[in-house]
């Protein structure tokens, strides 16, 4: 009976080893240090925690100048909004005992004010003259104005044509040798009044200083016969 007790202990120890092998875990050695596993686990967790920190540092960092420029733009935008709302509040002429309307209340009141004004204008339109804007008359009026602008009416002023074009051309009388070059020429009809006469600028007739009273006129022979409008030559 005393010898069988150690045999039971060996079989129990072998069963414990078999169960440990089935579980897949290594048997704890008698001299092993369990604190190493804890240290390894801590190191692994620290590495995982350092990875996202490294990724954040990899992103491009915005410079200080860019941040300041963005802040200035944002302040300018807000300032413009506030100025616009203040102008709208002044146009609405609200009186809240010194209090300022909120932005939503200002917009709502402006919408109601515009709707009321539009209804009043549609109900009783004020008489007025024709509008000169092309947008107010539609495409038909724009087409009419385009046609009239393309073909302007002819001017009602005097004609610019030369009066000499309608009159028959009459040859000019020859100048006297003793007359100045700028003296006016005599008309062909002045031959009947006497030789050696020339018409002055005032309409009076004067005698050329070098022309004789008895001599014939200095015009070429047969001038009166060949001049137009003087009739047929005599035989």
UniProtKB/Swiss-Prot annotation:
Outcome following mutation: residue 73 to P: In MSSD; completely abolishes the transcription activation with the dimerization partners TCF3, TCF4 and TCF12
Residues covered by the bHLH domain: 65-117
Keywords associated with the record: Cytoplasm, Developmental protein, Disease variant, DNA-binding, Nucleus, Transcription, Transcription regulation
One Gene Ontology CC term in the entry: nucleus
InterPro entries per record: bHLH_dom (IPR011598), E-box_TF_Regulators (IPR050283), HLH_DNA-bd_sf (IPR036638)
Signal peptide start-end: none
Region described as Disordered: spans on this chain: 1-69, 132-235
Chief location bin: nucleus
Effect of residue 75 to L: In MSSD; completely abolishes the transcription activation with the dimerization partners TCF3, TCF4 and TCF12
Composition skew (Basic residues), residue ranges: 55-67
Pfam families tied to this protein: HLH
MF annotations from Gene Ontology: DNA-binding transcription factor activity, RNA polymerase II-specific; protein heterodimerization activity; RNA polymerase II transcription regulatory region sequence-specific DNA binding
Gene Ontology BP, a term: regulation of transcription by RNA polymerase II
Compartments it resides in: Nucleus; Cytoplasm
Highest taxon, organism lineage: Eukaryota
Oligomer status and interactors: Heterodimer. Efficient DNA binding requires dimerization with another bHLH protein. Interacts with TCF3, TCF4, and TCF12.
Function field: Transcription factor, which play a role in limb development. Is an essential player in the regulatory network governing transcription of genes implicated in limb morphogenesis.
Disease: Split-hand/foot malformation with long bone deficiency 3: A disease characterized by the association of split-hand/foot malformation with long bone deficiency involving the tibia and fibula. Split-hand/foot malformation is a limb malformation involving the central rays of the autopod. Phenotypic expression is extremely variable between and within families, and even between limbs of a single patient, ranging from syndactyly and oligodactyly to the most severe monodactyly with only a single phalanx. Syndactyly, mesoaxial synostotic, with phalangeal reduction: An autosomal recessive, non-syndromic digit anomaly characterized by mesoaxial osseous synostosis at a metacarpal level, reduction of one or more phalanges, hypoplasia of distal phalanges of preaxial and postaxial digits, clinodactyly of fifth fingers, and preaxial fusion of toes.
Name of the protein: Class A basic helix-loop-helix protein 9
Gene field: BHLHA9
């Amino acid at each position: 009976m005393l010898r069988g007790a150690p045999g039971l202990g060996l079989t129990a120890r072998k069963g414990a080893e078999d169960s440990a092998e089935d579980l897949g875990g290594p048997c704890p050695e008698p001299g092993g240090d369990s604190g190493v596993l804890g240290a390894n686990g801590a190191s692994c967790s620290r590495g995982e925690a350092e990875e996202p920190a490294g990724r954040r540092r990899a992103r491009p960092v915005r410079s200080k100048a860019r941040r300041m420029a963005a802040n200035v733009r944002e302040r300018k935008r807000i300032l413009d909004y506030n100025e616009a709302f203040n102008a709208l509040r002044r146009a609405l002429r609200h009186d809240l005992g010194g209090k300022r309307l909120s932005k939503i209340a200002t917009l709502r009141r402006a919408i109601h004010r515009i709707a009321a004004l539009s209804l009043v204008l549609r109900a009783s339109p004020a008489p007025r003259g024709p509008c000169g804007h092309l947008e107010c008359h539609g495409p038909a009026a724009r087409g009419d104005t385009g046609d009239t602008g393309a073909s302007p009416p002819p001017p009602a002023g005097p004609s610019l044509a030369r009066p000499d074009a309608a009159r028959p051309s009459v040859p000019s009388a020859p100048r006297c040798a003793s007359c100045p070059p700028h003296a006016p020429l005599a008309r062909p009809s002045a031959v009947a009044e006497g030789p050696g006469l020339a018409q002055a600028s005032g309409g009076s007739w004067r005698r050329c200083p070098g022309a004789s009273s008895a001599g014939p006129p200095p015009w070429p022979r047969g001038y009166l016969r060949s001049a137009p409008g003087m009739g047929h030559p005599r035989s």
